Amino acid sequence: MSQTATLILTHGQIHTLDRANPLAEAVAIADGKIVATGSHDRIMSFAAEGTQIVDLKGHTVIPGLNDSHLHLIRGGLNYNLELRWEGVPSLADALRMLKDQADRTPSPQWVRVVGGWSEFQFAERRMPTLEELNDAAPDTPVFVLHLYDRALLNRAALKAVGYTKETPDPVGGEIVRDSRGNPTGMLIAKPNAMILYATLAKGPKLPLDLQVNSTRQFMRELNRLGLTSAIDAGGGFQNYPEDYEIIEQLHAKDQMTVRIAYNLFTQRPKQELEDFERWTDMLKPGQGTDFYRANGAGEMLVFSAADFEDFLQPRPDLPQGMEDELERVVRHLVEHRWPFRLHATYDESISRMLDVFEKVNRDIPFNGLHWFFDHAETITERNIERVKALGGGIAVQHRMAFQGEYFVDRYGKEAVKHTPPVAKMLELDVPVGLGTDATRVASYNPWTALYWLVSGRTVGGMAMYDDDNRLPRDVALELWTAGSAWFSSEQGKKGRLSAGQLADLVVLSKDYFSVAEEEIKGIESVLTVVDGKVVYAAGHFSPLAPPPIPVLPEWSPVVKVPGHYRSAPPAAAKIGAMVQMHQCCGSCGVHGHQHDIARRSSIPVSDEQAFWGVLGCSCFAF
C-alpha cells in the first residue's frame, strides 16, 4: 500500500533537480518529506481523505533555496530596527524613506540603514551626503553603512555615540574630521571594518521579546524570497551560547521557518583556541535537529587571518604570526573532527592558509572532513586544485554584485572577469555552494545573487564577466540548493525534490527558466513550503497563508518598508528593467528634458526645481 500524502501540489512545472526525474507535474508530501514526484494521475494515487490538494495553475516550482553564508541569527535580532534600501531605484526615494522613518522613530532610537545597497543601483549613481542626512533627520540619530568601507552618521548620531574632537582614531579606522578637527560624521575602514561595527553596536537594542518578533519577521521575509535553509556564519558580537537565546527559543517553540546550521565564530583575539576548546567540549557537529543544528567552526578562526574585503583600499598583508595561530586552531578542530569554514578574499591569503592546512593534514589527515573557504574572489586555479586535494569546498557570495565597480577601478576590467572564478571551480569539480553574506553589506535576496551569476552584472548594471564565467540558469539554481547542502554535510537530505528528501519547496511568481535576465531580480515566492507546511503564501495562494505576525515595535521600519524593495507589477516590469539597463540615459518622451544631465548632476536631490530631470518628474520611475 502506498504512503498517504498530507499535501499534494499539482498542475505545475516542478523542477526537481533530481536527474532521474528532472521535471514533474505534481509532488506528494508526508511527514515533512517528499513521497514522490510525477504526473498528476500518479501523484493523486497518494491522496486520501484529509489530503490537502493545491492547484499550482502552471506555476514553476523549485527546491527551497539554501544560503550557504548568511548571518541570519544576528541579523534577525536587529531586523525590525533596520530600514532596507535593497533594490530602491533612486537616492531620492531612499532619502524620502529615511525622512519618513526619522519622523516615526521615538527618542533615543536610531534610524539604521545597514547593508544591502550600492550607490550604483540609484538613478543618481551616488551616495547620500552628510548634509542630506542632517536635513532628512535633524534630531534623530542616523547610521548608514556603505559596504565594508564606510559609515555615515548625522549630527544627532555623532552626539549619541560621543565622538568628539578628542576621540582618537581606532587602529585600522579613521574618523574623518573637518578643518577644526571635529568629526564630520564619516567613518572610514582602513581597511578594518571594526570601527563601523563597533559604532553600530553603540545603538539601542530591542528587548528580548521584540528580538523574537524581529527574528520571526526576518525569517518570513526570507521565506517570501524562497529561502528555506541557511548556514549561519556567526559574526562579531555574536557569542555562543549567550547570543543564541532567541533562536533557541524559537526552535523550542517550533516557530522557525528557515532551517539553520550554525557555525561558531571566535570572539576573542589571541584567545581563539580557548574559544574553540570550550565549544568542542559543549557541542558535536550535527548536534540538534533538521531545523537547528551545529555545523562547526568559523567563519572567523583567528583574527590574524582576516583579510578585509574593502576593494576601495589596497589588499592587506596578513601578519607574520598568522600561520602559527591558525595552525593551533585548525589542528584542534581536525583532532575533534569539527568541520570548519574560513573567511578568505585574496589568493595571497589563501596560499598561506593552505600551507597551514596541508601541514596539519600531513600529521592528522582531514580524511573527508568538510571544510571550506568563504568568498575566495581572487583564488587562482592552482589554489583551487589545492583545495580539491584536501577535500575542501568554496562558498561563493554575490559581493561582487555590490563591489564590482570598485574592484574594476583598482584592479582593471581584465582582472574582474574571473572574480570569483566560479566556472573554473566547477570545472575542477570542487564543491561550490552559493549565498549572500547578508545582512551588513550585501542583500539577503537570493534572486539578486542568481541574477549576478547568470548575467554577470552588478546591481548597477555593469557587465563584469564573459560567457565563460557566467552560469546557465539550471547550474546556478543547483548551486543554490543541492550545492549548498554539502556545506552543512546534508547532501542527499535537502536540495532536490526526490523521494525521502526534506519537503522544502518554492512556487515562483515568474518562471525563472524563461523570463528575461533583468526580470530574475524581481522573482519572489508565491508559496513557500518548509517541512511540508506552508510558511508563506501570496497572490492566488493567499488563502493558504499562515496567520500574520504583527510587527513590533509599532514604529519599526518594517511596518512601512517590509523588507526588500518590491518591483513593479508584471505589466510594468519590462519597462523598469529597460531603464536599469540604460541607466536613465536619453531624453524623456513626455517632457523632452535630458535624463543623463540630471543623473550626473551634483545638485542636491532635495532641490527639485533645479534638479528637473530624472528625479524632477515622475518619468524617473520608468
Map each language-model feature to its residues.
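His/Asp/Glu-enriched, well-ordered alpha-helical/loop segment
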Residues: 331-341, 345-371, 375-376, 381-385, ...
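C-terminal functional module detector
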Residues: 485-487, 493, 507-520, 526-613
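Short, solvent-exposed loop/turn segments at the edges of secondary structure
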Residues: 76-80, 170, 255, 289, ...
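Acidic (Asp/Glu)-rich catalytic clusters
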Residues: 250-254, 280-292, 364-366, 387-391
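Divalent metal-binding segments
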Residues: 2-11, 15, 19-280, 295-349, ...
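Non-cysteine beta-strand/loop elements that form the S-adenosyl-L-methionine
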Residues: 71, 289-305, 391-401
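Flexible loop residues that form catalytic
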Residues: 17, 116, 235, 376-377, ...
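Residue-level recognition of conserved beta-strand edge/terminus positions
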Residues: 114, 145, 397, 506-509, ...
